[in-house]
Regions:
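Conserved active-site alpha-helix within GNAT-family acetyltransferase domains
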Residues: 131, 135, 143, 155-173
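Conserved GNAT-fold acetyl-CoA-binding loop/helix
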Residues: 47-69
Length: 180
């Protein structure tokens, strides 16, 4: 990887290490024993957002607590996936929500897989874990008959935006704000 001043230093091209990482890692549904690791990843996500928008994100917090994670894991409408290595160490998580508007007067009856939260552990970044997770979720969504995959990404996280674009995602809608 070449470091370029003023640009993202994340390389999204596949290399030997990434191919190797894909063979050693497994994506599966999260289990209750994964909760401590998921909470650690949620802290990492929060700090990325806090560093980018401290006016909105408190920092050193998690989006969900352990009790809420148990409910998410048990709910079929909120599939939560983790990527683990050969020692069953959680390297990444992906929270999903199944969305479908039925009989809406304007919106068609499509079934959407919404990615609510995704994080690759800081120590596992650059090893293809994110690509492995994303390929898994694409395959899962196709097999389950979803029309599309959607997510929201904060503008203060340009590396994530570049990653999603590299995965083939395109902007669907844009949220805007005016600070007062």
């Amino acid at each position: 990887m070449h470091l370029v001043p003023g640009r993202s230093n994340i390389d999204y091209s596949i290399d030997f290490n990434e191919s190797l990482a894909r063979h050693m890692n497994t994506v599966r549904r999260a289990r209750t024993e994964d909760i401590p690791s998921i909470l650690e990843l949620l802290l990492q996500v929060d700090m990325v957002h806090h560093n980018g928008r401290p006016d909105l994100f408190k920092g050193n917090a998690t989006k969900y607590n352990a009790e809420e994670l148990v409910a998410i894991i048990e709910n079929e409408k909120t599939p939560l996936f983790v990527c683990v290595d050969e020692e069953n160490t959680v390297l990444a998580h992906m929270f999903c929500i199944i969305k479908q508007e039925l009989n809406d007067s304007v919106i068609t009856d499509i079934k959407t897989l919404y990615i609510d939260d995704i994080c690759v552990d800081e120590k596992a970044r650059g090893l293809g874990v994110g690509r492995t997770m994303f390929q898994f979720i694409k395959d899962y969504a196709k097999e389950e008959g979803f029309y599309n995959i959607t997510l929201n990404v904060w503008c203060c996280n340009p590396d994530a935006m570049k990653f999603y674009e590299a995965m083939g995602m395109e902007p669907q809608k844009i949220g805007m704000e005016m600070l007062l």
